[in-house]
Amino acid sequence: MKLQVRVVEARNLPAMDLNGFSDPYVRLQLGKQRSRTKVVKKNLNPKWTEDFSFGVDDLNDELVVSVLDEDKYFNDDFVGQVRVSVSLVFDAENQSLGTVWYPLNPKKKGSKKDCGEILLKICFSQKNSVLDLTSSGDQTSASRSPDLRLESPIDPSTCASPSRSDDASSIPQTTFAGRFTQIFQKNAITATPTQSSSRSIDASDLSEISKPVFSLELSEDESSSTSFEELLKAMESKDQGSEPPSNLSGGVVVDQLFMISPSDLNIVLFASDSSFYASLTELQGTTEVQIGPWKAENDGESVKRVVSYLKAATKLIKAVKGTEEQTYLKADGEVYAVLASVATPDVPFGGTFKVEVLYCISPGPELPSGEQCSRLVVSWRLNFLQSTMMRGMIENGARQGLKDNFEQYANLLAQSVKPVDSKDIGLNKEQALSSLQAEPQSDWKLAVQYFANFTVLSTFLIGIYVFVHIVFAIPSAIQGLEFNGLDLPDSIGEFVVSGVLVLQCERVLQLISRFMQARKQKGSDHGIKAHGDGWLLTVALIEGVDLAAVDPSGHCDPYIVFTSNGKTRTSSIKFQKSNPQWNEIFEFDAMADPPSVLNVEVFDFDGPFDEAVSLGHAEVNFVRSNISDLADVWVPLQGKLAQACQSKLHLRIFLDHTGGGDVVRDYLNKMEKEVGKKINVRSPQTNSAFQKLFGLPQEEFLINDFTCHLKRKMPLQGRLFLSARIVGFYASIFGNKTKFFFLWEDIEEIQVLPPTLASMGSPIVVMTLRPNRGLDARIGAKTHDEEGRLKFHFHSFVSFNVAQKTIMALWKAKSLTPEQKVQAVEEESEQKLQSEESGLFLGVDDVRFSEVFSLTLPVPVSFFMELFGGGEVDRKAMERAGCQSYSCSPWESEKDDVYERQTYYRDKRISRYRGEVTSTQQKSLVPEKNGWLVEEVMTLHGVPLGDYFNLHLRYQMEESTSKPKTTYVRVYFGIEWLKSTRHQKRVTKNILVNLQDRLKMTFGFLEKEYSSRQQQQQVT
């Protein structure tokens, strides 16, 4: 039972903020179920018009509707509340209270404070939703079964309230009784249906029940297509914007686009005089078809009809009757949802179940030609009316029967209505991206964003007030400690007022400073074209909504970092924007392997070395998503700040393969070299079955599969499926299915354990996932440790060596180790040095150096130089300074007494930015001062504004003449600006502070290390 609540508007709300307004939103609660509306900014008469739906378990519950005022820094303020008893709604006429203004009550019962009013519509849905089944036995309601909450082909953002329907009924014109009879024909004599024991089924008639035969017989009084359209128009007028039902749990059997409008496709499929319907009956050979008229029910809120037919007799079975009910759950002119339920009591165990099929017709994507297209999605499930031991076999028969029948259905429909070619959809990418242009923000708009606030306004008014006071005031006599030119406060009140004025002016000056820094648009990876052939990922960043504000000004300086297959792209920084507009396009260089996920992270910019504040993050999973659905999508952000503000990003994502040739064959050839064994290309039928088994997109292809055992409490025999992006396991024992998969990128480690008695003498492959990854596959995990890592154990492979080599090759292809990344960076650095002939240091003379650090260390120069020696002291010092994955090349002689090397590491301070540091160092001997000169050029990768500058360091070490075994160190610092930016001072200051901290830490460690060595030598 569903309670529908529509929150329309409120009026005369009290002002809760100092600006004389409120930021109201509504929170609804029924039992443990909670929902809330959006926040309406600065409004005392807000309008929402949002619908909500709650499951009702107890009529004694109360619906609590609270109005609150959003506060960004403290707890939200309570405005008022309404309590409505569920039993009051249930006992009302038509189970509806109508649309009524309710007074908001204060928290304290005795208070007479006027809290305003709220307009609500509260009612019960007159019939259960398609997912709230009322039958008994094995059936499960949608509110309790996670299997029924699959992703809908309709936009999930509209999932506010369920659609209304009659009792769930109706399945398509196609049946699957033949599949059942083939399964049960061997047991037809001993196994009789629960409710059909009096019926005898001739085994000679069990052949073509899965080929329904329809001969259309319409009576004169049945509804015409005109009355059918009138009924739908009446239903459309009463549509309340409810959410179309989600796909049913049995799976999707048709998901196709057609070049026709949704309303026309609906007429083609369900009009009483439809020529398609007649052609389908002729093709499938069904006779004695009786199509009832469409009738309005529930005061026109739903439309329903009944169809009956007779299956033709065959050599195996006699004729079988079927009754089908079709009910419109939704019809609003754009989206149509029809639930069909079919009963076939004459098939074996036919009295124990009904089959339900859901047809969803919705608008398709926009085509370049401008023509309308529609998306047809057909899903199914079994509704068991009573328990039966043959449930697993019935489900298998239904699945195969529906698959065969709807292949005929889709092929016939494609002959009547032109399907959309995938090439036409691909062209839509160019059209979708061509309209995106990143427009620079004007200085006037930026000034309004910075200065249109209470701080500036109050400071301006106070300044005018003080100025007028100075004009009219008489100068006071000099007293106390005052003298000419110095006028001190003469009272505590004057002192407080002076302090307030100083603080206000300071804040205004800070705003002016930030405004001057933010005037110029900052660079990004927007417009950088991808290189190479392969899988090309294109991401269009449109806008962000309700990003969290971390600055005292109530705004943020957001930018986005996209990461896929180890490659990153960074957007520009939008200053003082909580709802920024980007309109930027990012292309990732072509990848040999199709990407599995796209990680999206939103940061607030405050200097390249400051601790990054994450405003939210999201993950776009290409394996679980249909790429066509990502062409225009709103991605909700995760994280404490993002979820509190309900932050979202508007993205357009396209994934194409730009290389020629056979993608599958090329990839398999690469894997064959790693495995050392030929890998056969799987047939299209096998690949299609693999994709449907795990719900994968069409570009996913099967590489190999192995029979093995999954080790849990008890070994489970099944098959391990390996593709370019996933590891999947499937087993079906006595009708109990075990199915899961996880990504190669989720695997942290793969181990091979020696054979044991429990593994039946076979080696065990242990796959350990990264913390909190692959949680959807935890059903197959052997253990789940305290760090949140899942471990999967597989053993008893028929050919263990081939399976192990294939697994390791695929894992290595998707997961590069840090050493491999270091090696790649070193090779790239060497090639760059050779091509530029050590030209990195040619510009050092143009850099302005300033001394930033100097001290005298009680260590000899020879020991100090171990800091650059590449040995244990070098490594420990870098780790102590927060440098991860540190690697360095050996010193090589460039010319007389000049040596050079390259280093690579990840700095903890910028690791949140996915930043890496590469540097080139040169050292030369200074004989006249008995010391060394070390020069270093550092380049920051993946850091905001990192491509705007290079860092230059110069270390001068010389032996102290006054004290033996003492080194005098001076460090000089300079920045080589490659591009102009108004943030030079801000970036320079940020880097300088962090550099000084790092030098103190490094030199302090060096002194302690030398002291410990001296003590060890004295002991020995």
UniProtKB/Swiss-Prot annotation:
Residues 1-102, 517-635 form the C2 domain. Its cofactor is Ca(2+). Induction: Up-regulated by Cold. Down-regulated by salt. Ca(2+) 2 binds at residues 17, 69, 71, 77. Residues 249-421, 848-1010 form the VASt domain. Residues 689-752 form the GRAM domain. It is found in: Membrane. Residues 134-144, 158-172 have a biased composition (Polar residues). It holds the Pfam family C2. PANTHER family: BNAA05G37250D PROTEIN, OS06G0297800 PROTEIN. This is C2 and GRAM domain-containing protein At1g03370.
